[in-house]
Amino acid sequence: MGALGRVLLWLQLCAMTRAAYKLWVPNTSFDTASNWNQNRTPCAGDAVQFPADKMVSVLVRDSHAISDMLLPLDGELVLASGAALSAAGGDSDPACNPGAPLLFRNPDRFSWLDPHLWSSGTQAPGLFSVDAERVPCSYDDVLFPRDGSFRVALGPGPNPVHVRSVSAVGQTFSRDEDLTAFLASREGRLRFHGSGALRVGSQACTDASGCVCGNAEMLPWICASLLQPLGGRCPQAACQDPLLPQGQCCDLCGAIVSLTHDPTFDLERYRARLLDLFLKQPQYQGLQVAVSKVLRDAHTEIQVVLVETEHATGAAGQLGHALLQDAVAQGSVLGIVSATLRQSGKPMTADSELNQSSSGAGLAGGVAALVLLALLGTVLLLLHRSGRLRWRRHEDAEPVSAGLPLGFRNPIFDAIVFKQQPSVELPDSAQKVDILDIDTKFGCFVNPLFAGEAEAEA
């Protein structure tokens, strides 16, 4: 094959291969203010300390005059061209605090799985990536600063991290054997640590419709790293019924358009169409759009996430409906087979927040009542089993003694209630009737208030 043929073949491979890059952002440079506990670089007369038990490689770019330096047990200071470290004289910078040493922050704080620490060099304005795709995907080329110092924690995910290649310290690793040897060397151990594993050699994405990122299993650890500064909790969405796109850690306000496609669909061309025909319109200026291929129910689809970055205005829903109409009108040209739309609810207002808090309070009250009832039942059961509390059936109760009177003694009258009366003779009959012989057993009592009158009449 001639030179021209090789050039044409290389151009064809470049066209077929849609290489994506992820750039590592943080560093362990001596001249980066965020690497020091006072958020400033050392000034003249400062005493500086490095963590004694941490391995770290630190690049020094400028010249510094310091009064004292405590170095780590295992590490290195790399002096760039023109850089120098010298002992400070008697004078110190008035802006410095000579009483407190300047401490180099923990270099192990940077995790591979933290989306904050990566940047995509191919991200156009108005576009963003869901959280799982902000970390290097399996088809990505990973770039670390060529002329900078860094340290990365691998893990703690369950599976090795797979990428296409890793470029670090002036070398590009695309074979596992070469990368493994580098990670085992002192130079590699100064820059990579942790329980996780890193693998290279994955294939680049050659599918015009896009490729699945491959970080679905790592998403819980990605979200843990992302939300660590927030205490592990997502901020509350500013709308009712928010949406959770696939690959995202927290709910969003906006809309999601799901597209099924045929082999003629081109992901990059569809992204460009969104930017040129829709996002440039004034009513959609405040929207952010993420377009990627995701795996759902063993099938792939194109997920278009529309997020309102400012106050909810309904623009995301409007754009979602516009994309549905565009899919109907131009679906055969774009390679779109079907499209569905999901939208979040209305913006959160004071009344809706009050209703949510009231319903939450009611639910909490109901749960608390159930817990109290369960505790009360448990206490009663324990008391019963210990013999301190007894209960009987109604039929097991002792019968009332038959000899006890059914009435009660009245202290005011202090008289016997039932008293035998003499026989009386009815005027219309010669028959005597004994009152005690009547079935009803009537009785009478002597009222002391009228006892005198009764005796007088007698």
Curated annotation (Swiss-Prot):
Signal peptide: 1-19
Cysteine disulfide partners in this protein: C43-C96, C137-C213, C205-C211, C223-C249, C234-C250, C239-C253
Membrane topology: Single-pass type I membrane protein
Keywords from the UniProt entry: Cell membrane, Coated pit, Developmental protein, Disulfide bond, Endosome, Glycoprotein, Membrane, Protein transport, Signal, Transmembrane, Transmembrane helix, Transport
A GO molecular function held by the record: cargo receptor activity
CC terms in the record's Gene Ontology section: apical part of cell; apical plasma membrane; brush border membrane; clathrin-coated pit; endocytic vesicle; endosome membrane; extracellular space; membrane
Chain intervals for the UniProt region annotation (Interaction with CUBN): 67-87
Location of the protein in the cell: Apical cell membrane; Cell membrane; Endosome membrane; Membrane, Coated pit
Single Gene Ontology BP annotation: receptor-mediated endocytosis
InterPro entries the UniProt entry points to: AMN
UniProt entry tagged with the keyword Transport: yes
PTM field: N-glycosylated. A soluble form arises by proteolytic removal of the membrane anchor.
Cytoplasmic side: 384-458
Residues on Extracellular side: 20-362
Tissues/organs with expression: Expressed in polarized epithelial cells which are specialized in resorption or transport, specifically kidney proximal tubules and intestinal epithelium.
Phenotype of the disrupted gene, per the record: Full embryonic lethality at about 10.5 dpc with failure of primitive middle streak assembly and absence of trunk mesoderm formation.
Membrane-spanning residues: 363-383
Residue ranges annotated for the VWFC domain, each copy included: 203-254
Glycosylation positions in this chain: N27, N355
Domain remark in the UniProt entry: The complex formed by AMN and CUBN is composed of a 400 Angstrom long stem and a globular crown region. The stem region is probably formed by AMN and the CUBN N-terminal region, including the EGF-like domains. The crown is probably formed by the CUBN CUB domains.
Note: The role of Amn in embryonic development seems to be species specific. In mice, null mutations lead to embryonic lethality. Human mutations give rise to much milder symptoms.
Assembly notes: Interacts (via extracellular region) with CUBN/cubilin. This gives rise to a huge complex containing one AMN chain and three CUBN chains.
Function of the molecule: Membrane-bound component of the endocytic receptor formed by AMN and CUBN. Required for normal CUBN glycosylation and trafficking to the cell surface. The complex formed by AMN and CUBN is required for efficient absorption of vitamin B12. Required for normal CUBN-mediated protein transport in the kidney.
The protein, known as: Protein amnionless
Species per Swiss-Prot/TrEMBL record: Mus musculus
